[in-house]
Amino acid sequence: MLGVLKKVFDPNKRQLARLEKIADQVDALGPEMARLSDEQLRQKTEEFKARYQQGESLDDLLVEAFAVVREGAKRVLGLYPYKVQIMGGVVLHEGDIAEMKTGEGKTLTATMPVYLNALTGRGVHVVTVNEYLATRDATEMGKLYEFLGMTVGLNLSGMSREEKQAAYNADITYGTNNEFGFDYLRDNMVLYKEHIVQRPLYYAIIDEVDSILIDEARTPLIISGTAQKSTKLYVQANAFVRTLRKDVDYTYDEKTKSVQLTEEGINKAERAFGIDNLFDLKHVTLNHHIQLALRAHVTMQRDVDYVVQDGKVIIVDPFTGRLMHGRRYSDGLHQAIEAKEGLEIQNESMTLATITFQNYFRMYEKLAGMTGTAKTEEEEFRNIYNMRVVVIPTNRPVIREDRPDLIYRTMEGKFRAVVEDIAARHAKGQPVLVGTVAIETSEMLSEMLKKRGIPHNVLNAKNHAKEAEIIAQAGQKGAVTIATNMAGRGTDIKLGEGVKELGGLAVIGTERHESRRIDNQLRGRSGRQGDPGVSQFYLSLEDELMRRFGSESLMAMMDRLGMDDSQPIQSKMVTRAVESAQKRVEGNNFDARKQLLQYDDVLREQREIIYRQRYEVLDSDNLRGIIEKMIHSVIERVVNAHTPKEEVPEEWNLKGLVEYLNAHLLPEGDVTEADLRGKEPEEMIELIWAKVKARYDEKEAQIPPEQMREFERVVVLRAVDMKWMHHIDAMEQLRQGIHLRAYGQVDPLREYQMEGYAMFEEMIAAIEEEVATYIMKAEIHHNLERQEVAKGEAVHPKEDGEEPKRKPVRKAVRVGRNDPCPCGSGKKYKHCCGRTV
């Protein structure tokens, strides 16, 4: 009954019926398009663009545009997209995922929605897993787009800025997920607007979408710079600050915990470091380190604000007195305290920018993807990316035979059987593709085949171009190919002459993967386009997945039945048990990714704010308005800190306020305590603001306006980049240590959100303060240059497709207490023979 209901209410069926209607309409235009000359076909592109500009939507143009691409493909590539490919194309245009089996022509399917969306002139990105595939597709499909009058760009790592700009300005850009992500990050670190390469993100089609959005979703892209000099500076600044005297060289205000160098202290610093002006822009870093060392010595007390444990400085929560593991003071204060305590200074890992694929791809207005296997992860695509998965039927029915798993007792027995199977098939000339989970396994199998004298190829996802050639040959008579899961993705295995009669390509899996999806990918390598084929998985009770989900009872059963290593179990029940184990692992992985995304969202919101504001700085001609707002909020904060509402005006610390103004905003004597006495905080703010504005105007008058504007931009960009870099670092440290808070009955995620928000507010305040100080205090030179705060290096996540190495399980003689007893009773060792031990 359930089966009948499912058929009636199957949403995929409804989708397909709708898609089929559209495909029929496209098909009906076939003869009309065939009558057009090449020139008339090319003219269609201009006609569509004009109609789009006049207000027709892409959906209105879809049927005709798809028909044009279809006809173009026939003339240029000699390929005519099938109806199922048109259906897949519609799914992609609608921003969903088309699940199309291997060999169904995904690359050609994508050309139709790519062309349609490129008519907007906003740029379409086609994303692949490696540069070999990007180059191959851009070259092959590029012929079709160029025939239809579109421009095609290829975005590879190592290209110059000009080459990248040209690639992104094309109608259609091919590239890898890594490169698109890194370009986004680099664009938000540029010092000149003209250096930006990407246009606003509009529409992307991701090939092998499951691999990029799920398997690699948690991989962060990181651009990092190193700060080698800084460790030395912390030590030098620390030694210098030890020589200073309170009230002579610096002033300290207990209430606001603010510490300032006096004129005398500033002179001392200039003498000690042999410089003429501490507030010169070229001494920003030194000044920063001296301020940090001062704060570490004067405002931070050991065993009150922090404790030292195992050579590490750990912060004490001022409200609860708990140790805040994993939290580090930001902006280098933590390192300054380490220098003060004579500990090893943890080198700042300068992450200049970072983003995960999940968050990068969620920024596109419209996102679509295609893959052979996505249905098992449908829930994740829907929840996180708001994409549906539509299973597109194959052009010809699949006649591959998927046999139930063969389960052996030990790994040794399993591999012996695999080699026998390969040898038997090789003898009759049937091509074999063997899939392994780890590189070690493929090397071990290769050794075993060498001993038997069977010629074969081994692929380990290291050299994409060469592997594509080998994989393409894997369907020839007598070919034996061993490949790790990811090797040669995106390349078709076409059958050689006479192979069909031998039963097509045989796919042998040597172990089940954690994810059903990857097993299905391996199976799908055989039986493309209605070819015959067979797939068979060999498992053993010692495989990792089997061990994780209780293979003891099976082991005991095999022993009781007196089965040895050479006799496998082949049963649907066991196959189902394996699948349910895989479902559990997939569920766990999904939860982990979902949780990570919630943590990541905190940084994502902050990143978007910072990047948006940074772009405004690059884009605006005159920053004075923005800077005045910053200075005003600094004045408000400082006045309010020194004149708390709960104190009577006589107790207000006006001396501290004047000292702050002298150190950061105004020349000495501009505002005195007498000027401020008897005034309300609002009046003080107005008075100080008027003085600051007057000084700002004086600066403006002394130098040409364009130089002043450039000076402002240098100061703001530097402050934002520096503080943001420290902030990313502090957020990462917070995230590493936050899970320890769960012991205190608090939700780590909420804590992370609250503290992350507070740290962000602190960072904004620090940016404003630094900008205010340098605008008001620095001397302006004629040869100002914008500077990067550190040289950025893109840290590539593991090379595409390289699986994290999984060690083969080695047998040990020692029996663990919870292991099955070696006597074969089926009980745990501790309840059986282990009792007496």
UniProtKB/Swiss-Prot annotation:
Q: How would you describe this protein's topology in the membrane?
A: Peripheral membrane protein
For this protein, the record's SUPFAM superfamilies field holds:
Helical scaffold and wing domains of SecA (SSF81886), P-loop containing nucleoside triphosphate hydrolases (SSF52540), Pre-protein crosslinking domain of SecA (SSF81767)
Q: Which cofactor does it need?
A: Zn(2+)
Record flagged with keyword ATP-binding: yes
Residues where ATP binds: 85, 103-107, 492
Gene Ontology biological process terms in this record: intracellular protein transmembrane transport; protein import; protein targeting; protein transport by the Sec complex
Alphabetic keyword roster: ATP-binding, Cell membrane, Cytoplasm, Membrane, Metal-binding, Nucleotide-binding, Protein transport, Translocase, Translocation, Transport, Zinc
A Gene Ontology molecular function term for this protein is: protein-exporting ATPase activity
Concerning InterPro entries, the annotation shows: Helicase_ATP-bd, Helicase_C-like, P-loop_NTPase, SEC_C_motif, SecA, SecA_CS, SecA_DEAD, SecA_motor_DEAD
Name the residue ranges with Basic and acidic residues bias: 787-806
| Catalytic activity annotation | ATP + H2O + cellular proteinSide 1 = ADP + phosphate + cellular proteinSide 2
Residues annotated as binding Zn(2+) are 821, 823, 832-833
Note accompanying the cofactor annotation: May bind 1 zinc ion per subunit.
Q: What does this protein do?
A: Part of the Sec protein translocase complex. Interacts with the SecYEG preprotein conducting channel. Has a central role in coupling the hydrolysis of ATP to the transfer of proteins into and across the cell membrane, serving as an ATP-driven molecular motor driving the stepwise translocation of polypeptide chains across the membrane.
Listed NCBIfam families: PRK09200.1, PRK12904.1, secA
Subunit details: Monomer and homodimer. Part of the essential Sec protein translocation apparatus which comprises SecA, SecYEG and auxiliary proteins SecDF. Other proteins may also be involved.
User: Which family does the UniProt entry place this protein in?
Assistant: Belongs to the SecA family.
> Which named protein is this?
Protein translocase subunit SecA 1
Taxon lineage:
Bacteria, Bacillati, Bacillota, Bacilli, Bacillales
